[in-house]
């Protein structure tokens, strides 16, 4: 199985995770779901539970709120869905981590991967300008991260209202 990188972008509740799951599920199982969310609040715990229930038994879940590079290295042969880069970035920001270093580590892991990977990320640059400096910094860093991932991806898909639009490559 060769490496093929897909980036799936979209707004909140756009259907991007479901679309990404479908891309991975079209490949032979088993599949690996790399989760970057942490259930720090009841609402997030409910969202995580809903995602798990939707996936089924062919999925193995790896929790990787920050060390995504190490998680990808553990998945040598199974197709991988990473959901999502947006939470991964915010986790690093809240930990006051070196974002450039962590992004470079992620890029190295993607380069070394030998299996198909689907990355999920929010497209946050189309909304209003955040009024708080941290919000603006997050929006800017997410935009740069999305650009870097899109540059290396074989395929980039934007999902709006559950409908995929190919930005790079084909559906």
Annotate the PLM regions.
Residues 31, 80, 155-158:
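Short, well-ordered beta-strand core segments
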Residues 7, 79-81, 118-120:
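Structural motif
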Residues 54-102:
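Helix-adjacent hinge/juxtasegments
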Residues 2, 6-74:
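Conserved P-loop
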